[in-house]
Amino acid sequence: ALLGACATPASGPSASADLLARSGSAVSGKVSFSEAGGKLRVEAQVAGLTPGEHGFHIHEVGDCSAPDASSAKGHFNPAGKAHGHHAGMERHGGDMPNLLANAAGEARFSGEISGLSLGGATGVVGRSVVIHADPDDYKSQPAGNSGKRIACGVIVAD
């Protein structure tokens, strides 16, 4: 009668974005999202980057059609705050840690972002995820001086 007691709980809702190369880059990859414990879990696997750090943000609009990804608009900012460090209180909801690409141009990220969800007013579904050419300095306004947008993916529910 207790056979199911140790079963892994069913996974909750999730979403993902397939990255499209933009601004002449060769970037590709996938970013996955799930909710757990009131935080948004983000997993990314990216290739085709230059080695080093790259700005990594959720943007307002789920539109990656522009060649430079400008159609994604600015950082998702449901609380109306200034741009800042992803771990700080004063930041855009869409501010995430820089991706670190290895010598082969590959980056992986796994972490939790507070203040965001899959749906609702703080929801990421229907928005976009963008990778930038340069690192986010976590202070310059409005976007961390992270350079051109080299990859963009629309976040869709799985």
Regions found by a protein language model. Give the residues of each.
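N-terminal leader/targeting pre-sequences
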Residues: G4-E53, I58-D158
